[in-house]
């Protein structure tokens, strides 16, 4: 959509923001024109996914973890403590196989999910950062995903499709966002989430301005508005995210 034009701003995920910068689709921003910039978590102000050569190309929006979402009726009193329930074939606490009952995210971040799992279970690979892999580590991660393919009943990319899958299609475990967990719990579905012992990957969204934005003043007003404490706290509660 940003390449097609007609949009002044976009809230981009961390795996898209640098591509937008490299493609010159978004412009450098002047942080002096955003009064609330200094209220941003210092860890995010110069984050590598929106800052290049000391230049800022966006305003941090929200960030959070990718959690393991699971069906509490299937798992009972046994909270899953490992991502192995979605990576390795096994019988779940209800006595049935996990095959075709688990999901996986359809996106590049899932390679990092696999690498993080291997970092814990195969330390001999020497993985220190699931986002920075050498070729051997990358191939091992891909092999794990190929193995997982035999278990996955459906790959998800749309949040509301996953909500429907867990409500109506018999899926019982998957990587997910707290947003879907919140909506399913709010709908009285038997759902909970956990960050397993291997840890979790995360996401961080950035609001960015199109390089040919027609309404630049409004764009800056929006970036300032999104940093307001009321908006950040309410959005964080609703989505299950961490305010910037």
Locate each region found by the language model.
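Hydrophobic residues within well-ordered alpha-helices
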Residues: 2, 20, 115, 165-169, ...
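A ligand-binding cleft/hinge motif common to bilobed small-molecule-binding domains
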Residues: 16-21, 175-190
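Periplasmic-binding protein-like
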Residues: 39, 142-148, 187-211
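Generic alpha-helical structural context detector
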Residues: 113-117, 182, 224, 237
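Mature extracytoplasmic/periplasmic domains
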Residues: 200, 205-244
